[in-house]
Amino acid sequence: MSDHAYWQVDVFARQAFKGNPLAVIADADHLSDAMMAQIANWTNLSETTFLLRPTTPEASYRVRIFTPAHELPFAGHPTLGTASVWASLPGNSHNGTIIQECGVGLVRVKVEDELFSFAAPPRKKSGRLNDAEYTQALAALNLTSEMVLDAAWGDNGPGWQVLHLRDQTVLRGIKPDWQAIGEAKYGVVAACAEGSETQFELRAFAGGGQGYEDPVTGSLNASIAQWLIEREIAPSRYLASQGAALGRDGRIVVESEGNTIWIGGLVTPRITGTISI
């Protein structure tokens, strides 16, 4: 049995317990794939990450990201949470830039005061949903075509299909059909009312097992930001919200700089200690 430093951090939250929690385990190089999967299933958080030594000199660290059911090549809030933990460890330093090695390659993370932001990775699949995919998406989310302005692939690792909805009323009224969702992952976005603090609101629905709604989702915000900004629907900098349906209050800072879109948020440690493995 070995003891490892362990954290649970709150990502994208401005108030305690209003973001998306993440478990982070340090010095995980000797852990087997099966053990990582077992630990992630036990923590039962949306994701658990394992800090490893990098395999390339360009990287600050390597990370593996697990849900309770499987491993992900990339995810947004685990990227920010893991980068924050790495930056807090003795002996680690950065000049405002951290390089994460993960399943999609190298991901840049920039640090500005308390704000951690990752560079949105390229989408593996984009373009509008075909007729069959669109029909399935409507059925899965109990929507009608009149409620949807556009629908596309926004797959940057997790496999998101994204829908731009008519308004926040439609977004907040979604009651997903988990059986119809199956193994798919759907993200929805709607513009906020004029005068709101945030410009867009999102929700994320992931199938598999019993299905769940994710409180605040970095990868989804990244793919939706790319989609909205390239269509000139969103400005180059905006603030998004997510999690209201679950009693959360996530805030996501989106900023486009040249060809890079940054997805940022605050990261706050809530639990620190050791885990015996």
How should each PLM-predicted stretch be described?
Residues 1-74, 80-277:
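Active-site proximal loop and beta-alpha junction motif in alpha/beta enzyme cores
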